[in-house]
């Protein structure tokens, strides 16, 4: 459970930095990339996903502030990669500003869901939904990048292989069998 906004915003800052890092790592060809159509419906481009991440931050902030589940149009051009990072940065700053001075009691108050009248969730859960949503779409971008053979940054600056290489020492240090 999230118990104070300052702690939440510090965690959000770490999540948004990783999103920006991964988007910044995309090659110039990423702007032209398109997901394959499914059932005749075109998939979103990476630029559309980036725009959606930024807009969704403000959507969740609006709901948390009891201003309605209001969607903000992305202030980026899906076809212009140069607009992606500025939009992510601007939406992150606006999100943090909209939450920074909200009362701590709002973390526990109930917020009615947009599509299920009578169903509500606590403020802290809504804020965690925003983070899960962002990580979901960042992972989507990273999966597409990997499938295209583009570089995908390690999530915490560590690869699975680098951790595997340390396992023998860890097992010895902690006296566990392999």
Task: Tell what function each PLM region has.
Residues 62-103:
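Helix-adjacent hinge/juxtasegments
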Residues 15, 22, 52, 56, ...:
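C-terminal ligand-sensing/allosteric alpha-helical core of TetR-family HTH transcriptional regulators
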Residues 2-9, 80-85, 127-131:
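Active-site rim elements
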Residues 101-117:
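Acidic catalytic patch
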Residues 1-2, 178:
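Short, low-complexity, intrinsically disordered N-terminal peptides in bacterial proteins
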Residues 9, 13-20, 30-75, 113-178:
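Short, contiguous alpha-helical
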Residues 23-28, 103:
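Short secondary-structure junctions
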């Amino acid at each position: 459970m999230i118990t104070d906004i300052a702690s939440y915003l510090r965690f959000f800052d770490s999540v948004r930095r990783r999103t920006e890092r991964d988007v910044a790592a995309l090659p110039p060809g990423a702007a032209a990339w398109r997901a394959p159509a499914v059932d005749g419906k075109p998939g979103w481009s990476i630029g559309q996903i980036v725009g959606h991440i930024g807009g969704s931050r403000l959507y969740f902030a609006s709901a948390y502030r009891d201003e309605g589940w209001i969607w903000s149009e992305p202030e980026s051009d899906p076809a212009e990669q140069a607009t992606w990072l500025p939009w992510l940065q601007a939406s992150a700053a606006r999100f943090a500003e909209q939450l920074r001075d909200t009362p701590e009691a709002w973390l526990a108050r109930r917020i009615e869901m947009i599509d299920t009248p009578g169903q509500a969730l606590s403020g802290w859960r809504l804020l965690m939904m925003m983070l899960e949503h962002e990580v979901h779409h960042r992972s989507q971008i990273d999966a597409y990048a990997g499938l295209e053979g583009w570089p995908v940054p390690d999530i915490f600056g560590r690869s699975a292989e680098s951790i595997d290489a340390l396992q023998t020492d860890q097992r010895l240090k902690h006296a566990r069998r392999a």
